């Protein structure tokens, strides 16, 4: 099993190029199911979840016309098998995103209940309720969602909780429904906006993406075309947090600051100097971080996907911080590993109290999920001595060449078998 070996203590200097966003690329790949015409997607990151999604689409009957670095062209002219098997879905929750497009395009879908990171219950009931409101007949049998419909009908759907994949699934399904669909309590994440822009480019009629009410007027068909996936805001935030923790001066290129307002504000609160350009962000840190308290919540609030990285930052901050997780239960699994590096953290329910100490000490730790992996890398970069991060297969689901990108700005990090 592969591991990362990190020798901490180095400041970071230089430039890092940001990849396309995994959480935008996956739904855009699924959107290719909505048209019989070729569809090209650019700025796709080379990640394990993307590879898994492409394999799933091929099983469904999608032809991959080209698959070059950063660009993939797909053709879903002949969908032969509207099924996502357990073997394909178990490692990637985003596979649920084929449900809406398959049902809208073919009238049927057989989708295994999803897996993914082990960070708590993330039910798909909002997807199912929404599609049922649009006229679909759905049953759960032997761990599979069995769905069928003649043609979906527009409906007013008020989601009980804010769900990004639920919003994306229902928005895609509604593009080919008869009539108008109104999604209430919709997710506002930039990735939802990116998907909406992709669908509009294919001929969909969508208004309100980025707000909590989205209106979709169904059309008879969507056409092909191309779409450029937005930069990864979580990768951007992860590298910025690493620089703020380690100290140094790094510019991230090919990214967007407008999707990271709250994160940038918290980094400034920690003491970082930040400059912003049209497609770049520069962060300079020349002092010990100040503690940053935060509370995760749906966008545009502080993202749950950045909570673990900020915990690593707070572990060596000059004071005490309070971090509250409101999105997922069981998303403090990295705390136990941070304490192996001598971090001083207490967990009380959904709140972690982090007492910053001057120095972490290197040790062997084990990654438990994708963002916990990033947290432990940052912790290793600031720890004295050697840190070994085990079970890093999580990393390859969401970060493209993270160790190479860190090494090019001065981190002492390498992957070993």
Curated annotation (Swiss-Prot):
Chain sites annotated for binding UDP-N-acetyl-alpha-D-glucosamine: 93, 122-126, 305, 327
Enzyme Commission number: 2.5.1.7
First-tier enzyme category under EC: transferase
GO biological process: cell division; cell wall organization; peptidoglycan biosynthetic process; regulation of cell shape; UDP-N-acetylgalactosamine biosynthetic process
Pathway the protein acts in: Cell wall biogenesis; peptidoglycan biosynthesis
UniProt superkingdom: Bacteria
Reaction catalysed by this enzyme: phosphoenolpyruvate + UDP-N-acetyl-alpha-D-glucosamine = UDP-N-acetyl-3-O-(1-carboxyvinyl)-alpha-D-glucosamine + phosphate
Protein keywords: Cell cycle, Cell division, Cell shape, Cell wall biogenesis/degradation, Cytoplasm, Peptidoglycan synthesis, Pyruvate, Transferase
Active site: 117
Sequence positions that bind phosphoenolpyruvate: 22-23
InterPro entries, sorted: Enolpyruvate_Tfrase_dom, Enolpyruvate_Tfrase_sf, MurA_subfamily, RNA3'P_cycl/enolpyr_Trfase_a/b, UDP_GlcNAc_COvinyl_MurA
GO cellular component: cytoplasm
Any one Pfam family match given in the protein's UniProt record, by short name: EPSP_synthase
Places the protein is found: Cytoplasm
MF-aspect GO terms: UDP-N-acetylglucosamine 1-carboxyvinyltransferase activity
Residues recorded as bearing 2-(S-cysteinyl)pyruvic acid O-phosphothioketal in the entry: 117
Function: Cell wall formation. Adds enolpyruvyl to UDP-N-acetylglucosamine.
NCBIfam families assigned to the protein according to its UniProt record, in alphabetical order: murA (TIGR01072), PRK09369.1 (NF006873)
Family, similarity comment: Belongs to the EPSP synthase family. MurA subfamily.
Protein name in UniProt: UDP-N-acetylglucosamine 1-carboxyvinyltransferase
Organism: Nitrosomonas eutropha (strain DSM 101675 / C91 / Nm57)
Gene: murA
């Amino acid at each position: 099993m592969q591991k990362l070996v990190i020798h901490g203590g180095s400041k970071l200097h230089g430039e890092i190029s940001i990849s396309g966003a995994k959480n935008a690329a996956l739904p855009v790949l699924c959107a290719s199911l909505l048209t019989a015409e070729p569809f090209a997607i650019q700025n796709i990151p080379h990640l394990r979840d993307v590879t898994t999604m492409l394999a799933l689409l091929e099983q469904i009957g999608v032809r991959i016309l080209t698959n070059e670095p950063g660009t993939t062209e797909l053709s879903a002219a002949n969908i032969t098998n509207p099924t996502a098997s357990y073997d394909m879905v178990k490692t990637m929750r985003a596979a649920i995103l084929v449900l809406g497009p398959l049902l809208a395009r073919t009238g049927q879908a057989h989708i295994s209940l999803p897996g993914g990171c082990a960070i708590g219950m993330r039910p798909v009931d909002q997807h199912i309720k929404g599609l049922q409101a649009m006229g679909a007949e759905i049953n759960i049998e032997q761990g599979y969602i069995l769905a069928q419909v003649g043609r979906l009908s527009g409906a007013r759907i008020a989601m009980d909780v804010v769900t990004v994949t639920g919003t994306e699934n229902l928005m895609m399904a509604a593009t080919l429904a008869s009539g108008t669909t109104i999604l209430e309590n919709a997710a506002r994440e930039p990735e939802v906006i990116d998907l909406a822009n992709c669908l509009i480019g294919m001929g969909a009629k969508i208004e309100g993406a980025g707000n909590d009410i989205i209106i979709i007027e169904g059309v008879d068909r969507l056409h092909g075309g191309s779409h450029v996936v937005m930069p990864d805001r979580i990768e951007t935030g992860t590298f910025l947090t690493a620089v703020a923790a380690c100290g140094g001066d790094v510019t991230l290129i090919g990214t967007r600051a407008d999707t990271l307002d709250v994160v940038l504000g918290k980094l400034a609160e920690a003491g970082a100097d930040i400059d912003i350009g049209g497609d770049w962000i520069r962060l300079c840190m020349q002092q010990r971080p100040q503690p940053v308290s935060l509370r995760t919540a749906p966008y545009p609030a502080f993202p749950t996907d950045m909570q673990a990285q900020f915990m690593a930052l707070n572990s060596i901050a000059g004071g005490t911080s309070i971090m509250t997780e409101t999105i997922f239960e069981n998303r403090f699994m990295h705390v136990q590993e941070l304490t192996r590096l001598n971090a001083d953290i207490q967990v009380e329910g959904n709140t972690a109290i982090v007492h910053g100490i001057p120095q972490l000490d290197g040790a062997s730790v084990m990654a438990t999920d994708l963002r916990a992996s990033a947290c432990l890398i940052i912790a290793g970069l600031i720890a004295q001595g050697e840190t070994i991060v085990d079970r890093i297969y999580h990393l390859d689901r969401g970060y493209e060449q993270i160790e190479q990108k860190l090494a090019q700005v001065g981190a002492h990090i390498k992957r070993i078998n």
